[in-house]
Amino acid sequence: MGKYFGTDGVRGEANLELTPELAFKLGRFGGYVLSQHETEAPKVFVGRDTRISGEMLESALVAGLLSVGIHVYKLGVLATPAVAYLVETEGASAGVMISASHNPALDNGIKFFGGDGFKLDDEKEAEIEALLDAEEDTLPRPSAEGLGILVDYPEGLRKYEGYLVSTGTPLDGMKVALDTANGAASTSARQIFADLGAQLTVIGETPDGLNINLNVGSTHPEALQEMVKESGSAIGLAFDGDSDRLIAVDENGDIVDGDKIMYIIGKYLSEKGQLAQNTIVTTVMSNLGFHKALNREGINKAVTAVGDRYVVEEMRKSGYNLGGEQSGHVILMDYNTTGDGQLSAVQLTKIMKETGKSLSELAAEVTIYPQKLVNIRVENAMKEKAMEVPAIKAIIEKMEEEMAGNGRILVRPSGTEPLLRVMAEAPTTEEVDYYVDTITDVVRAEIGID
C-alpha cells in the first residue's frame, strides 16, 4: 500500500480526508497515467454510489480528467463491477468508481480500473502517487479543442443490466427478496430480477445520500432475514453499498455467506467441467467447513492473503475462473474482472432453478464451523514479530496439538491498524472460546497494550 492508495483505492472521510482538491488531482494525474500511451482521444467511464458526497467528488474528479484532454462518460449511480464491465467491453482507456463500498455514508473513495477492466497494479498506483507528491504540476494543459468532452451515458447501466440478465435463466415467478443497501444496486437489481421473471420484494431501495449501508445490506442482513420469512421468498439477496459483494439468505431466514456461495457455484461448475483446473481461489479467512466440503467433492483450492485484490491476482496468474472471500466478494472471471454481487446473485438463482433444489439444500453441504475473531491492540513494530515471541509461539502450537486436525487457528497482523488478529474455528462454540481466550491471554500478557 502507498501513501494515498490502500488495498482498494483511495479512501477517507469525504471533504476532510478525501477532499475535492484531492479528487481533482486524482482525476488529472490518474487520467494522465492511464491514457498517456493512447493514440486517439482517451475515453474514461466514471460511476458513483449514492453517498451525499458522490456528486461533489465526481465534479472535481471529472474536472481533473477533462483538464488533461480526456473524454469523460458519466455513468451516474451504478455498481462498481458495472464500471469494470463497461471499460473492458467498450474499449475505454480506464474507469473510475466513486464509492467506499460497505463503509458508512461519511466516507467515500476513488477506485481506478485500467483499460483491461482490472484494478490498478502497484506500479501504476506508484506513478500516480509520485505525481501527487511532486513539487510542481508539469502535466500538459491543453486549451480549446484539446480539452476533454463530458458525455452523460445512462445507456451504460442498461447495457450492464442486459448483460447480467443474459447470463441467467428465467425464474418464472420465483419469490426473491432483495436488499440493495440504499446503494448502487438500487438502480439495477430490481430491473435485473424483474427481467428474469422473479416475483420481488425489495428493501433498502430508497437512498437519501446518508442511509447507504445503514442497518441494511450485506453487513446488516437482519432486516432481509425477516423479510424473507414474512414474504415466503425462496431466497434473499443482500448487496453492499457498491454491489461488489453478496450475502444470501435461504428460505428459512438463515445466512448463506461467501464461503457457501463459492461452494455452491464451484460445485455446479465442477460438475459441468467448467471450473478451471477444478480449483477455487479463497483466502486464509475461509471457514474450515468450506475446506472440508471442497475436499469431499475433490475440488482443489488455492489460498491467498485477505483481500479480493490478492484473490484476483492469483486467479489471473494461474488461470482460475472462480474465487472470493467469506465476506461475499465472489469473482466469476468468465463473466467479469472483479467481484460482482448482482452477477453472483443471478448465478445462484440459476443454479437453484436448474437443480430444483432450495438454497438451504444447496448450502447444507457445507457445515460452517463456529468461528471467533479477537483483535488485540499491540505496537505496530510488534505485530509483525508476534510469532517470534517464544510464549506466543508455544501456546499456539499447544492449542493446535489439542485440536488434532479438527479445528484451525490463525494469528495474523492487521494490514491497516496496530492490531494482532486471533481467530479460531472448532466444532463447538465452547471449544472456540477456549482456544481463542487461551491464546489472547498469552498475547496480551506478552505484547498487548490495552
UniProtKB/Swiss-Prot annotation:
Nucleotide-binding listed as a keyword: no
Catalytic activity annotation: alpha-D-glucosamine 1-phosphate = D-glucosamine 6-phosphate
Needed cofactors: Mg(2+)
CDD domains: GlmM
Active site positions, chain numbering: 101
Binding of Mg(2+), residues: 101, 240, 242, 244
Function, in words: Catalyzes the conversion of glucosamine-6-phosphate to glucosamine-1-phosphate.
NCBIfam families named in the record: glmM
UniProt name for this protein: Phosphoglucosamine mutase
Lineage, opening ranks: Bacteria, Bacillati, Bacillota, Bacilli, Lactobacillales
